[in-house]
């Protein structure tokens, strides 16, 4: 059913239907009633349209992710979608790649009132630019967050989680613990590296090596591990994602080394991949992060003056055969 058909059924112009759909107060009461009746009779999403007309809301949420190929991001999005649908909302997904121009294109939906609010998973370094584009619209940030500010956020304590992972390796007798990190424009990368280095310093370990992967992929993890094996190889590796850790495992095995006897490996995120390859990992409550982000956003939509909230959820260390 098109807007033209609704106009024909109501006996009004397409422009009048458009004004009704946009909740304009310039429409005569009798014409508004005709349009609403036509919508009802046409069975064209009657519940959604009726709600939009009553509340001046679209019941759509824009979700901007930095990398939908990242299993962690995909799981967070699943949690967002589940909670959104439970509350009568749908999501529009934008894979921004943390590119500000792509973000700008997606955010144009805010000014057109096509979406009621936005959930982002962009790099911390992009938050100031995003804030300028989003303005006062309801907004929640996932995983990447500022320590202070006006944007509500939900995530985990990355420093504590990484400290625990490195401490577990050190407690197991590992002396040469390396790290495979990623892009430092992401706050999680900086925080996890901070946790790694703090334990290395606290335990007075002589060995410290950080290799930066070009992407959050298995192939990038393989390349990073190859570099770590060149000189004075580690006896343990902590990777900031399960995909990087999976690549590291493959390189170790191809080099004829044993896991965990020669080199132990710990990942991060707690994805299905980690379970499949029996990888020790830090499990993030990814779907709960998504669900909580929706709760925060809907509260902001309903209460624009609601105070900013910073929610830190619990993580879990899962020990498997790689350590």
Predicted segments — roles?
Residues 98, 120-164, 185, 243, ...:
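Flexible loop/hinge segments that line or gate small-molecule binding clefts
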Residues 86-87, 200-206, 229-233, 254-259:
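Short helix-capping segments at alpha-helix termini
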Residues 114-121, 178-180, 211, 232-243, ...:
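Periplasmic-binding protein-like
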Residues 44-109, 113-116, 197:
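Amphipathic helical "hinge" segments at domain boundaries
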Residues 1-57:
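N-terminal helix-turn-helix DNA-binding module of bacterial transcription factors
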């Amino acid at each position: 059913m098109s807007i033209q058909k609704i106009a024909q059924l109501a006996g009004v112009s397409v422009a009048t239907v458009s004004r009704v759909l946009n909740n304009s107060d310039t429409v005569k009461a009798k014409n508004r009633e005709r349009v609403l009746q036509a919508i009802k009779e046409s069975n064209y999403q009657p519940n959604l349209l009726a709600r939009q007309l009553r509340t001046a809301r679209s019941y759509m949420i824009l979700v901007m992710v930095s990398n939908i190929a990242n299993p962690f991001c995909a799981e967070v999005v699943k949690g967002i979608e589940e909670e959104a649908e439970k509350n009568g909302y749908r999501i529009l997904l934008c894979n921004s790649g943390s590119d500000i121009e792509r973000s700008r294109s997606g955010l144009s939906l805010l000014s057109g009132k096509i979406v009621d609010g936005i959930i982002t998973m962009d790099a911390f370094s992009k938050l100031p630019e995003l804030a300028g584009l989003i303005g006062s619209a309801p907004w929640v940030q996932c995983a990447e967050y500022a320590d202070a500010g006006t944007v509500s956020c939900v995530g985990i304590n990355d420093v504590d989680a990484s400290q625990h992972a490195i401490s577990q390796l050190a407690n197991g007798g590992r002396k040469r613990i390396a790290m495979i990190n990623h892009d430092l424009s992401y706050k999680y990368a900086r925080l996890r590296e901070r946790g790694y280095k703090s334990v290395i310093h606290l335990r007075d370990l002589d060995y410290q090596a950080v290799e930066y992967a070009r992407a959050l992929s298995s192939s990038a993890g393989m390349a990073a591990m190859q570099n770590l094996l060149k000189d004075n190889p580690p006896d343990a590796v902590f990777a900031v994602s399960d995909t990087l850790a999976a690549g590291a495992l493959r390189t170790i095995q191809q080099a004829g080394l044993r896991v965990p006897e020669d080199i132990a490996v710990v990942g991060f995120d707690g994805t299905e991949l980690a379970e499949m390859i029996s990888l020790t990992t830090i499990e993030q409550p990814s779907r709960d992060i998504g669900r909580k982000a929706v709760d925060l956003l809907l509260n902001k939509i309903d209460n624009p003056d609601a105070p900013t909230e910073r929610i830190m959820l619990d993580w879990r260390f899962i020990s498997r055969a790689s350590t």
